[in-house]
Amino acid sequence: VVSPKQQYQEYVFQRIEDYKNSLARDELLRLGNDAALEIQDATEGQYFLTEVVMQETVDDIIRKRLRLPSFKRWREKHAKVRQAQKSPTHWGLERNSAVAAILPRLEAGDRALVVGGGAEAAAYLLAAHDVHLTCLFGDDRTCTRIETRMAAESLTGNFEAFVAMLGSWFPSLDQPVHLVVIDAGTLATLPSPRRVSLMARLQDATVPGGIHAVMPGGGGAAEAWVSLYPDWERIPVPARSTRTRGKRESSPGVLMSRPFPPATSHASTA
């Protein structure tokens, strides 16, 4: 699990990089000149300017401009923010959604895979629960948007994302995953051969007893894909505790559990 200090360092790094990326070339050059002058003033001209010294000075200038908090101040605020981030409703998810229902089964350090931009909210929620999160998206824009939001929310500690032609390429995973969240809308857009290939890879990458949560999104119905799990067990999703008058019930999604392999029988020699 990533320590608070590492999370803080990642937060500062990402804020600084985002600031640099927002500057035009002439502004970057002026920033470099400011850094060189600051180094010269601080050392009364007796210095050996290296790339490392320049980079550190530039980062310090940006940190002051952005008024980034100290680690102590950030940690105090971060604890309150992280508590809010762990709530499904913080990300616009219903408390009875399939992903919310599976949260009690997860532990920090578990591995999860999220597929499709329509499952964006689930990605943030899982990252807030300190799982090792891998995301697969079909386009650069979605990936960039989610990476940027992850960084802004200080959720990048155990997060990585890939852009791929879904169903044609699959990342090499160090270990199988405990949870896969799939955007039904993304599945609906794939040609059948690629959809079947993607689902086969996702199922193979899941530990026995692991869970797939198929979430409605982008006009795709989760129920439409239950047939892709012929040997898996369907897990009931808790019903909504209260109903809103006049409001149409939204689908919570579908939960499927990978079966355990049959126990190997050993002949008795007694």
Q: Language model features by range: what are they?
A:
Residues 1-90, 266-270:
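N-terminal accessory regions of S-adenosyl-L-methionine
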Residues 119-131:
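Conserved SAM-binding loop of SAM-dependent methyltransferases across substrates and taxa
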Residues 90-109:
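Conserved alpha-helix/loop element of class I SAM-dependent methyltransferases that forms part
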Residues 169-180:
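A short acidic, Gly/Pro-enriched loop at the edge of an enzyme's catalytic core
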Residues 208-218:
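Conserved beta-strand signature within the Rossmann-like core of class I S-adenosyl-L-methionine
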Residues 108-118:
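Conserved class I S-adenosyl-L-methionine
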Residues 194-208:
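A short glycine-rich, Lys/Arg-flanked "PGG" loop and its adjoining helix->strand segment in the class I
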Residues 220-270:
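Class I S-adenosyl-L-methionine
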